[in-house]
């Protein structure tokens, strides 16, 4: 019918996305365990940062601030493979964002801001944090932890007098994370570059195995390119410059194994400092606007539905949708939604007896540190399995600041997360670029 034909091109992206979202292969992908490397050192750094951050308020007689300090210490999750100078800049920036977020949302809660307005503020934060993470390429966990900080700021019934102590605790935690995660520069400043070359070699070997998936070659080329970026950064610093030629020659050999036409470039590594500002400028024209819009829209809807439904922590719903949308494709969003939803429900059941147990402050702190360390060793292998430790850890951290009914806390976490995951997938279906398709054009295959 003529009246309906104009709507068909507009619905084409939705139909294509629906075909992609409903692909049964996503369920198999959600069950698959991925290979991972170099996770132990990063896990130990994160565990040490969280342990120190929790211990300081506990020893100072302010256990109620331990949760905010440990949140600040979660900046240690970022930049784990970056060269030390970039890692320091990234951790300082993320730590500032975390501290400011906790302060701002504590202030909103203390001022008695209506729930729907705070929900809108959390969604706006999620969108802004997503844009930041995409532009400066923070990598996992992306904007999720920053949104978690907003939920922590809103938790409890804070007064204006709580704003400063909470922010100070978060800043101290972030500072400890910065010190722990950059301490290696004093002993072996070239360690990130050596690790990058080793990871590139491992990726190339994986791509050359018989029966390797087609995407393994692309992953190997990405690892080689990443290693070259790290070497270029090292070449611009006097403390690491001397080791660059040998590492570049090693990387050339790795690349030639992947591509016989590779040209040796060991003596011509450019000295390029990898600054956050330069990275953001180089990616400003890239595809960051659509993911940002999806995160903002999904966060607003998920948080509003949770608030209207009377769920106890509406910000967790926004965090759930944000986590689902931190990837680059519909496939990633669906797999992440399945893993996060199922993993959180199971994790909430595991958290219930831990929350009800009389662990005391130091017992709870010890469990949080162990769970955090274990999480970082498995999260890159299987996100759903990691949720079995992430969920109890997050709820125990919450209980450090605000003891609550264990069953209510666990139920809120499960419901809010599942709601957020569902809304995140809906955002993939419904939020698309505004494009005009001529009547003669045929939509391309789903991506």
Roles of regions detected by a PLM:
Residues 18-27, 44-54, 58, 62-84, ...:
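Pore- and pathway-forming membrane helices of multi-pass small-molecule/ion transporters and channels
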Residues 30-42, 60-61, 83-92, 111-114, ...:
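Short, amphipathic, aromatic/basic-enriched membrane-interface segments that mark the entry/exit
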Residues 100-111, 131-134, 153-161, 179-187, ...:
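Alpha-helical membrane-embedding segments
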Residues 1-51, 55, 59, 63, ...:
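Cytosolic regulatory and coupling regions of membrane transport/channel systems
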Residues 236-242, 329-330, 356, 372:
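A cross-kingdom feature marking solvent-exposed beta-strand/loop segments within repeated
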Residues 285-358:
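Core alpha-helical transmembrane segments of integral membrane proteins
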Residues 196-205, 361-381, 437-438:
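A compact, surface-exposed functional segment
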Residues 86-106, 347-350:
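Hydrophobic transmembrane alpha-helices and their membrane-interface boundaries in multi-pass
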């Amino acid at each position: 019918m003529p009246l309906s034909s104009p709507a068909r091109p507009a619905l084409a992206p939705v139909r294509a996305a629906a075909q992609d979202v409903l692909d049964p292969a996503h369920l198999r992908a959600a069950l698959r365990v991925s290979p991972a490397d170099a996770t132990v050192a990063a896990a130990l750094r994160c565990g040490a940062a969280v342990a120190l951050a929790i211990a300081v308020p506990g020893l100072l007689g302010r256990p109620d601030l331990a949760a905010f300090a440990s949140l600040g210490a979660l900046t240690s999750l970022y930049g784990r493979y970056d060269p030390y100078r970039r890692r320091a800049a990234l951790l300082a920036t993320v730590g500032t964002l975390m501290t400011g977020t906790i302060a701002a949302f504590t202030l909103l809660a203390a001022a008695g801001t209506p729930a729907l307005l705070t929900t809108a503020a959390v969604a706006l934060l999620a969108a802004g944090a997503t844009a930041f993470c995409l532009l400066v390429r923070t990598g996992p966990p992306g904007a999720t932890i920053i949104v978690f900080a907003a939920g922590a700021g809103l938790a409890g019934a804070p007064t204006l007098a709580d704003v400063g102590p909470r922010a100070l605790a978060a800043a101290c935690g972030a500072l400890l994370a910065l010190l722990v995660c950059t301490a290696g520069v004093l002993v072996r400043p070239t360690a990130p570059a050596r690790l990058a070359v080793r990871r590139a070699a491992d990726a190339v070997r994986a791509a050359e195995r018989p029966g390797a998936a087609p995407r393994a070659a692309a992953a190997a080329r990405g690892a080689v390119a990443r290693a070259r970026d790290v070497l270029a950064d090292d070449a611009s610093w006097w403390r690491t410059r001397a080791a660059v030629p040998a590492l570049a020659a090693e990387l050339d050999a790795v690349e030639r194994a992947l591509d016989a036409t590779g040209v040796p470039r060991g003596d011509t590594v450019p000295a390029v400092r990898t600054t956050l500002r330069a990275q953001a400028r180089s990616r400003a024209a890239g595809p960051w606007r659509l993911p940002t819009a999806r995160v903002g829209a999904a966060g607003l809807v998920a948080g509003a539905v949770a608030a209207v439904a009377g769920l106890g922590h509406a910000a967790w719903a926004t965090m759930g949708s944000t986590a689902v949308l931190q990837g680059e494709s519909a496939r990633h969003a669906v797999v992440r939604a399945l893993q996060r939803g199922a993993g959180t429900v199971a994790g909430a059941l595991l958290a219930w007896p831990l929350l009800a147990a009389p662990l005391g402050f130091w017992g709870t702190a010890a469990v949080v540190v162990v769970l955090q360390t274990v999480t970082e060793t498995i999260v890159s292998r299987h996100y759903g399995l990691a949720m079995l430790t992430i969920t109890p850890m997050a709820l125990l951290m919450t209980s450090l600041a605000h003891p609550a009914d264990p069953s209510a806390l666990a139920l809120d976490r499960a419901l809010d997360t599942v709601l957020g995951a569902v809304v995140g997938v809906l955002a993939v279906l419904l939020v698309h670029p505004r494009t005009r398709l001529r009547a003669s054009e045929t939509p391309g295959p789903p991506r």
